[in-house]
């Protein structure tokens, strides 16, 4: 009753038995076999389309395939009759298939899409793809005149808006020549406590500022600050900056009648407070000026009551402490005439309690005259020229900047001798031993003992180096050198201990005194007796180098700075990043080698027995450190 369904598996079995092994023919349903038997053109077109990928087939192969098709159709003849009803249902699908085949035959060769054309299209599309390279930039517009200058000179262009006044190291005068500008008692205090000759920065300041300051103060005591303007001073360390700003303060304020805060001197550290206080105390002898200092060792409440009862004329203070007193209203700023920033670069880098904003907020609220220039701001630093952008918050009025007559950033004292020790990388292990040998070679003169300040990079390095030097001296690795003052100072010890160590170092009567320090000693410590500075670890910038070396060759005395440079890397860093920023006097010293080649080879020559002793000292320190940790 019903026709048998078409079974493709039977057709596949019959096809596989008759298939030639050379050509593999896919299984085709019966309806397609019937069409292939009755329609030779359709079969030819179908064969042509099925063999499209094999263009090298011959006509003989085509005949063989057609004969095989006929054999396959004959083998499935009984099944064909049973599938006629099924074929009728799929006639529409078969018609569409035949139409597709006929359309493919009618296509022209140019319309057919081949794999070669696809590759060609891909090649064309890739022509506009660029590699990941930077976008071309327009050429820079440069000033041809600047090409003739050294690149380091460009750093000095930040002060174009200020009135620049240059000075050189030869500007030295007798203090007696300022007899008409300075009070007689003040002049006597200067010559008896300090010097009879001025330093260059003092000379230029007294020549340019004192006459204007005196005349403006006589004309109008309330508004003289606006006529004078603000003063910015770029001077090397140890050039007499403290005396340079202290003398004008005492000269103007000596005749005041009522105690009011008229001058505030901001310093970055408590150690500097004592130095400035000593200077002003000596200058103000014989006057009624009240010079006070505020420091953390004192109770804030006691200082508050003290300032309320007896207001100072000149106050020396750190930024954080100043904010505390302003918030407690220990004093007001109505009568403030001078604001001095000593070591300004470090002050401007500090943000303790936002001291800058708090100070100028109170200054604006307390002052009746709120126009610019109501306070003379005196900014002093050895590295001032790098901080032009930070001075914006000081609200400068008609500023005058005093610069050394040099295109370099920083100036080195004329009598400072710089010596470089180029240590090979292979000898870096014995760097502490080489340091001890260099200290041993330093000779003390008959006039003064050798006081050596050694700078290291960290607190741990300071402690470790001191212990190792003590161990080497105790082992007799260097003869006749055990009897010397040797200590270290760092931020891990208390302020009282630090001050005591500094006093012991300064007053030591031994022929050699060595103090190992971090950069805490690099600023503002006024010890004129330091003969040598050794940079055991190279500073990170030319600015830090200037402050370190400024501990010696102070007050026009001789000084020596020895730099230990390990390997070519540190030697290159010193020459390219430190030395290029430094200006030296033509008549002064220039950097040179510590020793000639023959003596330098003797310095680096270390015997095996000495190596064993040195390594034994290191092992001893390691053992003691492990024992302390337990």
UniProtKB/Swiss-Prot annotation:
Residues 1-91 are annotated as: Disordered. Residues 434-601 form the Helicase C-terminal domain. PROSITE patterns: DEAD_ATP_HELICASE, HELICASE_ATP_BIND_1, HELICASE_CTER. It is found in: Nucleus, Nucleolus. It catalyses: ATP + H2O = ADP + phosphate + H(+). One of its GO terms (cellular component) is nucleolus. Residues 37-68 have a biased composition (Acidic residues). The keyword ATP-binding applies. Keywords: ATP-binding, Helicase, Hydrolase, Nucleotide-binding, Nucleus, Ribosome biogenesis, RNA-binding, rRNA processing. GO terms for biological process: rRNA processing. ATP binds at residues 235-242. Residues 78-91 have a biased composition (Polar residues). A motif (DEAD box) lies at residues 342-345. GO terms for molecular function: ATP binding; ATP hydrolysis activity; RNA binding; RNA helicase activity. It is an enzyme of class 3 (hydrolase). CDD domains: DEADc_DDX51 (cd17956), SF2_C_DEAD (cd18787). Its EC number is 3.6.4.13. It holds the Pfam family DEAD. ATP-binding RNA helicase involved in the biogenesis of 60S ribosomal subunits and is required for the normal formation of 25S and 5.8S rRNAs. The Q motif is unique to and characteristic of the DEAD box family of RNA helicases and controls ATP binding and hydrolysis. Associated with pre-ribosomal particles. PANTHER family: RNA HELICASE. This is ATP-dependent RNA helicase DBP6. It comes from Kluyveromyces lactis (strain ATCC 8585 / CBS 2359 / DSM 70799 / NBRC 1267 / NRRL Y-1140 / WM37). The gene is DBP6.
